[in-house]
Regions:
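Positively charged n-region of N-terminal signal peptides that target proteins for export
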Residues: 1-4
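Extended active-site neighborhood of metal-dependent phosphoesterases/phosphodiesterases
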Residues: 26-49, 105, 109-224, 256-262, ...
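Active-site glycine-centered loops adjacent to acidic/histidine catalytic or metal-binding residues
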Residues: 64, 97-98, 139-140, 234, ...
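His/acidic metal-ligating clusters that form di-metal
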Residues: 83-92, 127-133, 190, 195-197, ...
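Short, solvent-exposed loop/turn elements at domain surfaces
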Residues: 67-73, 102, 206-208, 240, ...
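N-terminal active-site segment of His-dependent metallophosphoesterases
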Residues: 23-113
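Bacterial N-terminal signal peptides
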Residues: 7-16
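A short C-terminal boundary segment appended to hydrolase-like catalytic domains
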Residues: 23-37, 312-382
């Protein structure tokens, strides 16, 4: 009799489980059927494509889309990422810079305008047609803020044409602006109770008057009454990749900038430029170093890991102490890049970055010693 009841319970359990699995497959099938044909084909070819659980707000974050100087074409990874947006159904798309392939004095006005036209074809126009807001920061290949010996901008024409493109009413990125007086270089906007600030991190230097504007914006009631604050910039605070581990490739006075951002409770700084995805933190500031979709992914410093092109689905849960979760995909394979696959810390020339799931106190003595021997204690603290 006991054996009969055991078999009966097992049969009932299997029936319920089978129904649940079938329902899950049906839901997936229903979602697949609603997707555009191009999206559905990519999802089917990927096999078990991870669909992260939704929370309050979802961003898809991309970066560094460009290829060679003057190019008006984009790598397949860019088009693939754009095609997958209907699968992830973000509330907004965010880009941490380098949307076009400028920063060359040899480029003519017509060539620069052609690059922005190509960007519009591949990225901006599809987003507008999908009614997806697009928050972004200017990169060095978009409109570098590097200056000459007289203090003028080396790439003045590129800056003028970038501003011209973005300020055309037909190119409205669909943002709820708060301050757009110096858009697209320095501006603020809000989205679903999140305050966003974009600064011009297209070079390592931010002038004092612009830093004053940044601080004033972060101190404003709009910023402080928001549930969360996010900063967008191109150059990161600290170096993480080979070929970028030197002054000029990160923001000057990184620790001072971080202290200011922490003072106003900025949660996350989203950056690009180093062409490597690394989910890090330093102190109380989350540092999302974005992978690229364009040309030239870079390896991490002190690592043998192969470089990967990647994009990140960032979900925000206002009830969670962590606020954010990342689902980052190798855009070639569409496999998730897990935290455990990445270095536990990176010790670039101007300071340590720790992987976001690890605290300073959890680092091994050998890891702390490695950093301190290279950089000294001041640059290796929590």
């Amino acid at each position: 009799m006991a054996r009969f009841f055991t078999l009966l319970i097992a049969t009932v359990f299997l029936s319920i489980a089978s129904a649940h699995w079938a329902a899950s497959e049906m839901v997936d099938g229903e979602k697949l059927a609603t997707l555009p044909a191009e999206t559905a084909q990519i999802v089917e070819e990927a096999g078990n494509l991870y669909d992260p659980p939704r929370h309050d707000v979802r961003l898809v974050v991309i970066s560094d889309l460009n290829t060679v100087y003057g190019s008006t074409d984009y790598p397949p990874a860019v088009d693939k990422g754009m095609a997958l947006l209907p699968f992830w159904e973000p509330d907004m798309v965010v880009c941490s810079g380098d949307m076009v392939a400028g920063q060359s004095p040899a480029l003519t006005k017509a060539q620069i305008q052609a690059m922005w036209d190509a960007f519009d074809d591949h990225v901006a126009r599809p987003l507008r047609e999908a009614n997806l807001p697009y928050g972004f920061t200017i990169g060095n290949h978009d409109a570098s803020s590097a200056r000459n010996v007289n203090g003028g901008f080396l790439f003045q024409q590129e800056r003028e044409l970038a501003s011209e493109y973005w300020n055309q009413p037909t190119h409205n990125p669909g943002l709820d602006f708060i301050d757009r007086a110096d858009f697209p270089f320095y501006y603020t906007f809000k989205h679903q109770d999140i305050f966003f600030l974009a600064w011009d991190g297209s070079s390592s230097y931010i002038p004092p008057e612009k830093l004053a504007w940044v601080e004033q914006a972060l101190a404003s009631p709009e910023a402080q009454q928001a549930k969360m604050r996010i900063l967008l910039g191109h150059l990161p605070l600290y170096a993480i990749s080979v070929g970028r581990n030197q002054p000029g490739e990160v923001m000057e006075n990184a620790d001072d900038l971080r202290a200011m951002l922490e003072k106003y409770d900025v949660h996350t700084y989203i950056s690009g430029h180093h062409h490597a995805y690394y989910p890090g933190h330093r102190g109380d500031l989350q540092l999302l170093h974005m992978g690229i979709l364009g040309s030239g992914p870079r390896p991490f410093i002190d690592s043998n890991l192969p470089p990967k092109k990647a994009l990140t689905v960032l979900d925000i849960d206002f009830d969670s102490p962590e606020l954010t979760t990342y689902a980052t995909y190798d855009i070639q394979t569409l496999q998730l890049i897990e935290y455990e696959q990445l270095p536990r810390l990176l010790a670039g020339h101007n300071g340590i970055v720790i992987r976001r799931d690890i605290e300073w106190e959890e680092l091994r003595p050998s890891e702390k010693a490695f950093c301190e021997q290279r950089l000294g204690k001041e640059l290796c603290g929590p």
